[in-house]
Amino acid sequence: VDSKSLAKTIFKRITKDVYDEENDDLLFQGHIQGDLLLRKSICEYLLQSRGFKVEAEQLIISSGTEYLFYIIFKLFNNEIYGLENPCHKMFKELFLTNNVSFKAISLDEAGVVVEELKKYNVNIAYVTPSHQFPTGTIMSISRRTELLNWANENPDRYIVEDDYDSEFKYTGRPIPALKATDINDKVIYLGSFSKSISPAIRVSYLVLPKALLNIYQRKLPYFICPVPTLNQKILYRFIKDGHFVKHINKMRTLYKKKREFLVNIIKTYSSKILDKEIYIQGADAGLH
């Protein structure tokens, strides 16, 4: 994240405005799923930018992916998860720490290999279709269809879509989220502001299928949103007033230039110093 480009002045002004409103909500514990206005603003953003409609009651605000996975783990009983291989080491540690069974599922140039999900009797598949970490692969349209078909074959199967790095695609039209083609409500959607704004924001969110929302409300009525009310109201204003979209557009241009600069240096070094051509894996997207 480029800290110099963070909209510090805007955040400072919004913070002052929120305090000046003398809102009593700041003194009390908010809704367990997060501030309603923030959830509604995220729903509007998802419709405009990621291509799918969701209701605010399906959205849960939290302070990190690990918290969201704790919720997901509690929704299911002894299911086998499928993790992309390779993936971020944090996820394997997260699953091991919580004693959750998982299988490492191979990747090819189109994304996760669906046949392996069947082979290992996986019921919950965790995928990063917008920009896989660490390979940089964007899941193909045909593989997305195949993955959704796999989920639709069994009522107990679900897909966890981590829309990691989706804001930063530098060439061509943005690809809609996997959730946008999920007509049977089989995708659990994860989003975060840590990459798009700053890791210090520590606000992430989860969109639950309606069938799982009922289970969540029954099993986790005690699980209170860990994000301070003040932070949620500041982020709501940042989104509502149009600053978030402007920030994303600005950062997309900046990161594209940085990526092009880095790629040119690598190619120049490889041809002049190493005397060989190199292949750069991954799409023109994301921060890695």
Regions found by a protein language model. Name each.
Residues 162-163:
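Walker B catalytic acidic pair
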Residues 15-156, 166-167, 173-181, 255:
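Conserved core of the PLP fold type I
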Residues 60, 176-177, 217, 235, ...:
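Catalytic cores of nucleotide-enabled group-transfer and carboxylate-activating enzymes in metabolic
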Residues 253-263, 274-288:
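Conserved glycine-rich beta-strand-loop-beta hairpin in the small C-terminal domain of fold type I
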Residues 179-216:
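Active-site PLP attachment segment
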Residues 217-220, 241-263:
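Structural signature of PLP-dependent enzymes
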Residues 213-231:
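Active-site C-terminal subdomain of aminotransferase-like
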Residues 1-22:
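Conserved N-terminal helix/loop that builds the PLP phosphate-binding region
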